[in-house]
Regions:
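Generic hydrophobic alpha-helical scaffold/packing signal
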Residues: 10, 14, 39, 49, ...
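Cysteine-nucleophile active-site neighborhood
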Residues: 45-124
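Amide-donor transfer/coupling interface in amidating biosynthetic enzymes
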Residues: 106-205
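Short, glycine-/Ser/Thr-/acidic-enriched flexible segments
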Residues: 1-2, 27-28, 43-46, 79-80, ...
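Phosphate-binding active sites in nucleotide-utilizing proteins
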Residues: 2-55, 60-65
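Structural motif
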Residues: 39-41, 73, 175
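Glycine-rich, charged/polar anion/phosphate-binding loops
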Residues: 21-27, 82-84, 119-123, 158-161
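Conserved active-site and cofactor/substrate-binding residues in soluble primary-metabolism enzymes
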Residues: 4, 8-11, 15, 57, ...
Length: 205
């Protein structure tokens, strides 16, 4: 359900000293213990919506981690999973993690496709104001928010610009897939946020 990651992203995270631990919401796994960061990538959660909806261990574990302030990046399918629900093209609605106040509705036609320039906004932990990276969008769903969130970035393409992405706690979530090799500063930013979270945990003991 969440199997799309640019391999360069994982390589760059490892090169900066990150230890990557894997778990599967489809298998109802909890988030590995004592993590300092969380990465939920893209995929097709709508194809596994019923199974994901029933896997409460994974959903509650992820929600708890985000609410604790674990620096989290969620891209496309991962973003969809963190909303309150996914509605299929058949009109069936399945409850998801529920951290983001809104739902996702699937369409039979593409909602977005193509490469994007990404401009950081609101000095979020991943992209500071003025930092630029590249990535892409590819999705058939639309997000219908119930609450307003500060936009994490501005996307520019040949069709124009839009301010999107959600900032919530230490969560950056949206449809765009980041390509960290386009600006490795994003990796440094994320690693630093994870180290700060790790230090906060130590100080709380």
């Amino acid at each position: 359900a969440f199997n799309f990651y640019y391999e360069e992203n994982l390589q760059l995270l490892r090169a900066r000293g990150a230890e990557l631990l894997f778990f599967s919401p489809l298998a109802n796994d909890p988030v590995p213990e004592d993590v300092d960061g969380l990465y939920i990538g893209g995929g097709f959660p709508e194809e596994f919506a019923e199974k994901l909806a029933s896997n409460e261990v994974s959903k509650q574990s992820i929600k708890a981690m985000i609410e604790k302030g674990v620096p989290t990046v969620a891209e496309c399918g991962g973003f969809m999973y963190l909303t309150k629900s996914i509605e299929t093209t058949e009109g069936m609605s399945y409850p998801m993690v529920g951290v983001i106040d809104g739902k996702v509705a699937m369409q039979s036609t593409l909602a977005a496709l193509g490469y994007r320039e990404i401009f950081g906004m609101n000095d979020n932990f991943l992209m500071k104001e003025g930092e630029v990276a590249k990535g892409h969008e590819f999705h058939y769903s639309i997000f219908q928010p119930n609450s307003l969130y500060p936009p994490a970035y501005e996307l520019k393409s040949r069709f124009g610009a839009k301010r999107v992405g959600c900032i919530l706690h230490s969560l950056i979530a949206g449809y765009v897939h980041f390509h960290f090799a386009s600006n490795s500063k994003l990796v440094d930013n994320w690693i630093n946020a994870c180290l700060q979270f790790q230090e906060q945990k130590r100080n709380a003991i």
